[in-house]
Amino acid sequence: MITHLNVTSIYVLDKDEALDFYVNKMGLEKGSDVKQGDYRWLTVRVPGDASTEISLETPGAPLHDEQTGEVMRGLVTKGAMGGLVFLTDDIHGLFETLKEQLLPSEALYP
């Protein structure tokens, strides 16, 4: 019987840039960071919640052939490869924090 989701994956173009974004902009914490040959298992998670981690995956080898990786990188660039939904106890405070850290005001108020 399935009891819990432990790991979910999102595709990113650059694992180090994604790690910086999720940790330093979104406030998540780094989970696992293990290198095995050419593959790097890198996860982030909500601070204090080690039960669910988000694996940051790059399209291409060793998970995909080059043609598939190229198609997937194009989809990631367009923002078409899924997303995440987080819960918060202060949506207005989170909005203000993200507005200051992530978005130029023109992006929110053209």
Where in the sequence are the language-model features?
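Vicinal oxygen chelate
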Residues: 1-6, 29-110
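Conserved beta-strand-loop-alpha-helix junction that forms the acyl-donor binding cleft
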Residues: 9-15
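Short Gly/charged-rich anion-binding patches and loops
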Residues: 17-18, 93
